[in-house]
């Protein structure tokens, strides 16, 4: 029939036929109830109102999007983490086994996926575990994976596990184990527990951190004859001054502490020992001239007898 400029067909999406079988149900212009095909798309009405969300019809479950269109040929993750698959005609698999994209699944009497298996939705991988979408660290077939709070799998990145151990999630999601690997130009070794075992720099969440004994290093660390100070979260100090144990240090843009050189900070002059600590309450002779550094490590000026070049006349 033609009604209000729309081509309407009345019936239900069929499991064996994409076209509905017309029932004895009567659809009125106002107050219609049941399935209606409008311009080739199926919608479900109750008392004239287009429905959304979960609907049950003839013992089968359907899910209707916000615009009333029904899900078909796709997975859906419900708000409680349960997982469903909707067939080509819209109904969810019910109390059966099915093979989808090469993987086997079991569906219960409530249409939910049973057991554990991977699913691909919107180009992302999800792990169904005991019938629910898994989150956090998971183990599958002896490999470790990390799943976001929405269940999607992470890959191509460094992550810390719940014990603070460092792991690298490769392109297919599993953490490297029992092998060596070159990542972003740096070499790493991973043990059978998927923990990085050698001391090496990593980039995690856009920040440089140092892997040491399988965990993120903190505090003072030495690498390639340079000293670094790593904060409690493992990030390194850079482009800043720092006082530790009453000693003053300055860090360059790449994180190493300046050493054996002059440093000017906020208009004050400092000179740094080989370990990066600024001179303090002591004399320095350099270039044949003497300089005095005060308790705050700044070079003394004006309050002592200094020459035009800031050198002390100490003999």
Task: List the predicted regions and their residue ranges.
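Extracellular adhesion/carbohydrate-binding repeat motifs centered on closely spaced tryptophans
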Residues: 1-315
